[in-house]
């Protein structure tokens, strides 16, 4: 066998392995989202004041234990979450949207963008006297399919716990 022929054979094998790898990644890839919402008997401005006062999170928030940094589009923040029955995790996302009395949204990535991304949002909608708080996380990227249902369930339970604590804090003022 000549060197050029074995080089072509090796190249063909490598291309085949790469194709199989990409097909597996695509087969395992699945974008996912989790959401929890709650109605709060206070206007959005009252709920916003609590949500935006991130320095007070440790005193009332069972899920987002700490949020450090400025809530301004483009700024990098540090977020420590404590999902129920799990170890705390720290992320450093970039703030995408801040609309007073309406929405906070940030995007975090593990490694490089597109590998494993999480876009988190808090949306406030009003029916006149009450606020509908919608907390949502959209997971996307090549490795999202590796997220276990257990992690998603625990994270959602954390959303619910935070929403309930926020409701209690807002309605008791």
Predicted regions located by residue number:
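Short beta-edge strand/loop motif at the mouth of beta-sheet-based domains
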Residues: 55-90, 98-99, 103
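Hydrophobic/aromatic beta-strand elements that line small-molecule binding cavities or substrate pockets
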Residues: 36-38, 91-97, 108, 118-126
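A conserved amphipathic terminal alpha-helix motif
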Residues: 3-12, 132-134, 138-173
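Hydrophobic pocket/interface hotspot
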Residues: 46-51, 57, 77-79, 95, ...
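Short glycine/serine/proline-enriched coil/turn segments at secondary-structure junctions
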Residues: 85-87, 112-116
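A mature extracytoplasmic/lumenal domain signature
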Residues: 63, 81-83, 97-99, 108-110, ...
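Hydrophobic ligand-binding cavity/cleft-lining segments
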Residues: 2-72
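A short, structured loop/turn motif at beta-sheet edges
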Residues: 41-44, 72-73, 96-103, 123-132, ...
């Amino acid at each position: 066998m000549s060197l050029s022929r074995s080089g072509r054979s090796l190249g063909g094998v490598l291309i085949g392995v790469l194709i199989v790898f990409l097909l597996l990644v695509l087969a395992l890839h699945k974008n996912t989202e989790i959401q929890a919402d709650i109605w709060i008997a206070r206007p959005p401005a009252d709920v916003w004041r609590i949500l935006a006062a991130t320095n007070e999170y440790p005193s009332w928030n069972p899920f987002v234990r700490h949020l450090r940094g400025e809530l301004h589009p483009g700024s990098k923040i540090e977020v420590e979450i404590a999902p129920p029955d799990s170890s705390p995790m720290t992320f450093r996302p970039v703030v995408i949207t801040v609309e007073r009395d309406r929405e906070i949204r940030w995007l975090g990535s593990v490694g490089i963008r597109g590998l494993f991304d999480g876009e988190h949002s808090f949306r406030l909608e009003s029916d006149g006297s009450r606020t509908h708080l919608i907390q949502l996380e959209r997971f996307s990227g090549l490795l999202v399919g590796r997220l276990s249902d257990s992690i998603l369930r625990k994270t959602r339970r954390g959303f619910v716990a935070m929403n309930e604590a926020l409701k209690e804090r807002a309605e008791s003022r």
